UniProtKB/Swiss-Prot annotation:
Gene3D superfamilies: 1.20.5.2650. Transmembrane segments: none annotated. One of its GO terms (biological process) is translation. This is Small ribosomal subunit protein eS6. The gene is RPS6. Coiled coil: none annotated. One of its GO terms (cellular component) is ribosome. Ribosomal protein S6 is the major substrate of protein kinases in eukaryote ribosomes. It comes from Leishmania infantum. Residues 223-238 have a biased composition (Basic residues). SMART domains: Ribosomal_S6e.
Length: 249
């Protein structure tokens, strides 16, 4: 079995091979993805470490899926973006049946991914004793504020992490990322205009509705007046006919 150990604090990852003799002394069925385990079960060099199980795959490359309480392969009906069904495949709303592994460890698991939750006494070579600096800084304005502890009134553009681009035969230059979700006066003006247009649209719609209701009311009033006039005329004619018939007698 291979063990991928990641230390997000330093940004380092390294793969180790665990012998079968070590695995025979461990009941792998007692562990599942998401659990924190003692690093000593994978070897004495990891004594004192606490690992969190993040993922893995079996000997045929089928990935482990969290939440599936099984130690073998299962066939799941999954949608796009799920484990085993890439987003760029299939159609929108389509579901496919894919073979995946459960979240319970077993003896036929070939690779396990873990992260270090607690550092032990002895450093792990290439993982905890080194640091891999990030090549790129944050792009989002809120994350830049969080990184430099800035207030909402301070200008974020002054604190963008720039990197130096070196090319042979050319002058070195600094390259800065485009800040995402940056609130500028232009953005504020656009949002204010959008809100103003929305309010004007609602007011215009309300005015049109009032005019429409007024028109309906006037039409109904005119219809009632016509009906009343018609009934009155019919009543007058009926009375005149009764008077004429009475006079003939």
């Amino acid at each position: 079995m291979y063990l991928n150990i990641a230390y997000p604090r330093n940004g380092t990852v390294k793969q180790f091979e665990i012998s079968d003799e070590v695995l025979r002394r461990v009941q792998l069925q007692d562990y599942r993805l998401g659990n924190e385990v003692d690093g000593a079960i994978f070897g004495s060099e990891f004594k004192g470490y606490i690992f969190r199980l993040r993922g893995g795959s079996d000997k045929d490359g089928f990935p482990m899926v969290p939440g599936v309480l099984a130690s073998s392969r299962v066939s799941l009906l999954v949608k796009r973006g799920a484990i085993g069904f890439n987003t760029f495949r299939g159609y929108q709303g389509e579901r496919r049946r894919k073979n995946v592994r459960g979240c319970v460890l077993a003896s036929d698991i070939a690779l396990v991914n873990v992260t270090i939750s607690k550092v032990g006494d002895q450093p792990i070579e290439g993982v905890t004793d080194t640091t891999a600096p990030r090549r790129l800084g944050p792009k989002r304005a809120s994350k830049i504020r969080k990184l430099f502890n800035l207030s909402r009134t301070e200008d974020v553009r002054k604190y963008v992490v720039r990197r130096r681009v070196v090319k042979s035969g050319k002058k070195d230059r600094l390259k800065a990322p485009k800040i995402q979700r940056l609130i500028t006066p232009r953005v504020k003006a656009r949002r204010a205009k959008k809100a103003k247009d929305a309010i004007a649209k609602v007011r215009a719609s309300a005015a049109e509705r009032r005019e429409y209701l007024r028109l309906i009311a006037s039409n109904r009033r005119a219809l009632r007046q016509r009906d009343h006039s018609k009934k009155h005329t019919q009543k007058v004619h009926a009375q005149r006919a009764e008077v004429a018939a009475f006079q003939k007698k």
